[in-house]
A protein has these predicted regions:
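N-terminal cap/lid segment of alpha/beta-hydrolase-fold proteins
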Residues: 1-15
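Conserved HGGG/HGGXW glycine-rich cap/lid loop of the alpha/beta-hydrolase fold
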Residues: 14-73
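Active-site loop/oxyanion-hole signature of alpha/beta-hydrolase fold enzymes
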Residues: 61-107, 111
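Conserved hydrolase catalytic core segment
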Residues: 98-142
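Flexible "cap/lid" loop of the alpha/beta hydrolase fold
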Residues: 125-166
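Alpha/beta-hydrolase
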Residues: 148, 159-236, 255
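Conserved loop-alpha-helix segment in the C-terminal half of the alpha/beta-hydrolase fold
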Residues: 221-271
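Catalytic active-site module of serine/aspartate enzymes centered on a nucleophile-bearing elbow/loop
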Residues: 263-296
Length: 296
């Protein structure tokens, strides 16, 4: 039976929850998984657990401070890249992850790129940029472009809310939900994996303070995030993954692919924002091949 070890790391007077799946075998470096949000949790990454068993590779996932088992509230001073990067650095040290692969999904990819480009960490064997972005402005622009494919009344509701800053109108709530259903994910059905259905403490405060009120409007502490000028300096091999109907549009994914020197781009044509859920088997095979090719 696959070993799963859970624990907590003391961090800034709070506790960061982590979950380690499997054990390291041979020369296979562990894979650290950085979840999205900000304010989401590690839960959805549990659909990748069998990678540990099939590949003999340890997976390390954790709930970033502010959500899930690392829930903290009323601390807006914590919801910024500096704190989340410090948490990642301390977790690597705490768990002895001196050499590892990094996978960041959505906001987790922003965290990964900020860490790689501005903190020059050692021991990173490769990176996987899954449905992510190199700049907040680019994400916002692409979302607003895709909003134009919604019915006109939904476009109007989003435009009105964006202009007024009032996101409570039911028409806006319906429009935003439809947009996310088309490009992020829908509510998990009864036959979905348990990790996608079980109750979770999402860090809404972390999301709103860190990012903004919705995907179209980056107004938070991450609004000036932009590593576009540093992509050419990335030395680690990079696998870019995105979906054809993703919030991470093909334009965003190709922008990164064109600029990161040693990169490969895999487009899951029919997927939305969570390719690893929607095409789980194909995604795990892709990861296996990529990680084994980049362990040295």
């Amino acid at each position: 039976m696959m070993e799963i070890r859970e624990g907590y790391m003391p961090f800034m007077g709070y506790q960061t929850y982590y979950r380690m799946v499997g054990t390291q075998t041979g020369n296979k470096k562990p894979l650290i998984l950085l979840h999205g949000g900000p304010g989401s949790t590690h839960n959805y990454f549990e659909v990748l657990d069998r990678l540990a068993e099939e590949d003999g590779r340890q997976l390390v996932m954790y709930d970033q401070i502010g959500c899930g088992e690392s829930y903290v509230e009323d601390r807006p001073d914590l919801w910024n890249a500096e704190v989340w990067i410090r948490e990642l650095e301390e977790l690597r040290s705490h768990l002895g992850l001196s050499q590892a692969h990094l996978l960041g999904q959505s906001w987790g990819g922003m965290l990964l790129l900020e860490y790689l480009c501005n903190h020059e960490p050692e021991g990173i064997k490769s990176i996987i940029l899954s449905s992510t972005l190199p700049a907040s402005w680019m994400w916002g622009q692409e979302q607003m472009r895709m909003v134009r494919y919604l019915p006109q009344e939904m476009q109007d509701a989003i435009e009105k809310a964006t202009a007024s800053g009032d996101y409570s109108d039911p028409a806006y709530v319906e429009a935003e939900a439809e947009y996310m259903r088309r490009h992020a994910a829908e509510t998990p059905k009864e036959d979905a994996p348990d990790c996608l259905r079980r109750p979770v403490r999402k860090g809404l405060e972390a999301y709103i303070t860190g990012w903004g009120p919705n995907e179209f409007t980056p107004l938070g502490t991450l609004k000036d995030y932009d590593v576009t000028g540093q992509l050419r300096d990335i030395k680690a091999p990079a696998l870019i993954v995105s979906g054809g109907d993703d919030l991470c549009t093909p334009y965003i994914a190709k922008y990164m692919y064109d600029r990161i020197p040693e990169s490969r781009w895999e487009l899951f044509r029919t997927c939305r924002h969570m390719c690893f859920v929607e095409e789980n088997e194909q995604y795990i095979k892709l990861l296996k091949d990529w990680l084994n090719a980049n362990d040295e």
